[in-house]
Amino acid sequence: MNYSSFLVVRVIPIMVYRRTEKVVRRLAQRHAAIIAAARATAAEAGMAAVQIAPVAERAGIAAGTVYRYFPSKTDLVAALVAAVSEAEIDAMRRAADAAPGPLSGLATGIATFAARALARRRLAWAVIAEPVDAEADQVRRVYRRALAAEIEMRLKAAIKAGALPPEDSTRAAAALVGALLEGLIGPLAPAISAEPAATRDTVQQLTLFALRAVGVTDPRARGLVVQLPSDGPLAVG
């Protein structure tokens, strides 16, 4: 037999690359740094200023590195909207959960949202209302729905406890979201002084309006607003 006619094939094992915890952590930190840089940029100059190159410079990395995480500006803006939205909903939820009762939770949640929006009004406008691409706008709509759902949950809890009259909580929540956004950062919103006292008064007035709108009697609504912790939502700076 002519063994020279046989083809000898060597099987070389292929090592499957697996990211170590250190690599995963580093990637997550870089992702967070990019989002933080984009957030700071939007807070200063609006969403239109969120471009790959300046965000990369602010984050201290190369523009090519940003593209590895976000292939386009649209992807970066959508991720920024999602990150900020999630943080705001979480802050609102934690504040409301810490309140002693359902009506207090509703008041505290609304006040927290209002105070944080006023403290970062330019960023709030960029995330909520400034014109963006369709993809980012879709993420924005998800945020609005999440905000309405959070308020609706508080309304249902108050209705169940007998603290509010029966009502269509879904429509009421949607109406409150529209009123709050327009009253805080919309084109019809009046100019607001940066002085803490002026900010506090605005938050109290909007919270009072929201409570009255869903059926809280005026004395009770005023009592809830007065009881808002000064070191809580009204102290956001």
Segments and roles (model prediction):
Residues 51, 124-128, 167, 219-224:
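Short, hydrophobic secondary-structure boundary micro-motifs
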Residues 33, 41-75, 79:
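Helix-turn-helix
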Residues 27-39, 55, 80-84, 88, ...:
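Generic hydrophobic, amphipathic alpha-helix propensity
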Residues 1-18, 149, 153-160, 185-189, ...:
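C-terminal peripheral helix-coil segments that are non-catalytic and often amphipathic
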Residues 94, 126-134, 226-227:
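Short linear capping/connector segments at secondary-structure termini
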Residues 89, 119, 135-161, 170-185, ...:
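Amphipathic alpha-helical packing segments from all-alpha helical-bundle domains
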Residues 79, 90-122, 173-176, 200-203, ...:
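Hydrophobic alpha-helical connector segments
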